[in-house]
From Swiss-Prot:
Pfam family, one: NAD_kinase
SUPFAM superfamilies: NAD kinase/diacylglycerol kinase-like (SSF111331)
Catalytic machinery residues: D75 (proton acceptor)
Chain's gene name: nadK
Species this chain originates from: Wolinella succinogenes (strain ATCC 29543 / DSM 1740 / CCUG 13145 / JCM 31913 / LMG 7466 / NCTC 11488 / FDC 602W)
Task performed by this protein: Involved in the regulation of the intracellular balance of NAD and NADP, and is a key enzyme in the biosynthesis of NADP. Catalyzes specifically the phosphorylation on 2'-hydroxyl of the adenosine moiety of NAD to yield NADP.
Subcellular location: Cytoplasm
Protein name (Swiss-Prot/TrEMBL): NAD kinase
Amino acid sequence: MILMQPLSSLSKVGVILRPSSPSLKEFFLQVRSLFEREGIEVMLDSISGGMIGIYGCDFQRLCSESDMLVSIGGDGTLISVVRRSYPYGKPILGINMGRLGFLTDVRQDEVEAFVQKLKAGEYRIDSRLMLEGELSSPKGTQRFFAFNEAIVTRRPISGMIHVKASIGEEPFNTYFGDGLIVATPTGSTAYNISAGGPVVYPYSKNMILTPICAHSLTQRPLVLPSEFEVELEMLEGEFANIVVDGQEIMDFGYGDRLRLKVAERPALLVHKKEHNYFQVLREKFSWGDA
């Protein structure tokens, strides 16, 4: 789903910088000046502020008071901001300072012109499906949200793992191998594609299940509609890990259960009006090159 309507007003933005990058101070000052020139107030989160020696506010206040969040870094920074700010439902603009820039499509040299377009309402807001996870174990229940994927994976020096998968209350498969990826359409071009999973249009409402190095030639990726809930259970073998968007890790042991479903609300990403997903695929993956 694509939301073509911009915000009714844009008076304040909250900025989050890529961690461990104090060299971003000069660029942040430039970005702040560009927004302020358009009459838009700029807030900075406290962790970013401490990194570059400028006052910042706590993340909760930043999200609550801002009309839009601005992530300055790479795709990893944007994903972190999406996950942390998800309860607040704010649209997020990604300025690309990284290598890939699959999600952060505004380059450094485009910022000045794009800030003017933001003020004029000449942009679009895309909605991206999120996953909601619930891990039940003897330690209790942990809930989380995933933007790209949740992965059940063996530990670095352990053997293969055995995972039972059910759709709703119906068991449908067991996976024996290095792990299993449950990805969103947005995450289909991340770890999922490296493991042989399909590319799924990011505005589709699906979940993708892709085995990692399965010990069977018949184990293949599966695309499910969004109304299904997937339950994963460890059957035997050593402890495994659950890795969420490459940024959060949890233990997953014998008898533990992981439930995954499509979250009630999507994440909101700010893009140029002319943003074209298939053009991004061609450029980032070098598709069509002779």
